[in-house]
């Protein structure tokens, strides 16, 4: 089983797809990595030679920020925005959409579940 950046790649998948299990590598970046290292994209992970696995590992570590480093970098960027008090930082802190989307309706993913507010109760009528 190939292990890159602390992640075990699934053995029965094609290398092209298996690389996308790494945080920070999607399909297009995976194809680019395979083209630059000369590894056949149709090879299954279990059929990778040790040289191919080593070539993939060294190329990825040398050229890309993935997994924990990338997550840390993103967190630090958001923290920087919050610390300097930018509009984007305030939106992150408030848990609202950051990129100008509307919030009167929608934005449920960012704002969380809907909180129902109880309506005004009717006073019992006097008879």
From Swiss-Prot:
GO cellular component: cytosol; small ribosomal subunit
Keyword field: Ribonucleoprotein, Ribosomal protein, RNA-binding, rRNA-binding, tRNA-binding
Gene Ontology annotations of biological process type: translation
Annotated Pfam families: Ribosomal_S13 (PF00416)
Top-level division of the source organism's lineage: Bacteria
Keyword Protein transport: no
tRNA-binding keyword on record: yes
GO molecular function: rRNA binding; structural constituent of ribosome; tRNA binding
Region (Disordered): 92-127
InterPro entries: Rbsml_uS13_C, Ribosomal_uS13, Ribosomal_uS13-like_H2TH, Ribosomal_uS13_bac-type, Ribosomal_uS13_CS
Basic residues bias (residue ranges): 101-127
HAMAP family with a match to the protein in the record: Ribosomal_uS13 (MF_01315)
Subunit structure: Part of the 30S ribosomal subunit. Forms a loose heterodimer with protein S19. Forms two bridges to the 50S subunit in the 70S ribosome.
UniProt function note: Located at the top of the head of the 30S subunit, it contacts several helices of the 16S rRNA. In the 70S ribosome it contacts the 23S rRNA (bridge B1a) and protein L5 of the 50S subunit (bridge B1b), connecting the 2 subunits; these bridges are implicated in subunit movement. Contacts the tRNAs in the A and P-sites.
Family to which this protein belongs: Belongs to the universal ribosomal protein uS13 family.
Name of this protein: Small ribosomal subunit protein uS13
Species of origin: Gloeothece citriformis (strain PCC 7424)
Lineage: Bacteria, Bacillati, Cyanobacteriota, Cyanophyceae, Oscillatoriophycideae
Gene: rpsM
């Amino acid at each position: 089983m190939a292990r890159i950046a602390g992640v075990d790649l699934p053995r029965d998948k094609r290398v092209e797809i298996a690389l996308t299990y790494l945080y920070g590598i999607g399909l297009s970046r995976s194809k680019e990595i395979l083209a630059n290292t000369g590894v056949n994209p149709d090879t299954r992970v279990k059929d990778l030679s040790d040289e191919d696995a080593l070539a993939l590992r060294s190329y990825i570590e040398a050229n890309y920020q993935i997994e924990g480093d990338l997550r840390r970098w993103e967190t630090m960027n958001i923290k920087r925005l919050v610390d300097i008090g930018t509009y984007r930082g305030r939106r992150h802190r408030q848990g609202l959409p950051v990129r100008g989307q509307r919030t009167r309706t929608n934005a449920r993913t960012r704002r969380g579940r809907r909180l129902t507010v109880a309506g005004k109760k009717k006073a019992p009528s006097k008879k």
